[in-house]
Amino acid sequence: MNYSLSAILYGIAERISEFSDRPIYKSPTQQKCEPPCFFLCLMPGGIRDEIDNRYFSDINIDIVYLQAPNIVNATTNVFTVLENLDQKLDTIPYTIGNETTSMIVYNRKHHLENMDLHYQISLHTRVKKSEVETLMKSMEDIINVKKQI
C-alpha cells in the first residue's frame, strides 16, 4: 500500500478526536485561532532505497497542543493531554480507498515550550516503487518476435 501524507494526518486527527473536541489544524496557521487547539506539523524525515524496488521513508510529525496563556490549571491540562496521546497513539488508522490498516508509531517523545506541549512521533513506511517498463527491453522483444515470423 502506498502512503499519503494527508491520510496519515487524518488518521492522527481521528485518534486525537477520540479524547478531545478541540480544533485540529494541519499546520501553524496565519489566521487567528482560539486556544486550546492542536497543530499537526510535518518535520524533516528521510528516504532511502531498499531492495526489491522499494524505498523506506521516515515520516516525522510534531503534534503541538496550544493552550490559552496564564490559565490556572495549565500543567494539569498538559499532562492530561500527554497521557491521552500516549494511550491513543500506539497505532494510527490509515485508509486509502477501500483499504484500511494501522500504522505503528515509533520514537514518541515530548517536551514543553512555554507551556505548549510538543509531542513528536515517527512513522516508518516501506513503499514499493511503481515499475517503469524499460523501452529497450520491449524493443528487443519486438525484434525477437519478428525473427520468429
Regions found by a protein language model. Give the residues of each.
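A short, hydrophobic beta-strand-centered structural micro-motif
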Residues: 34-43
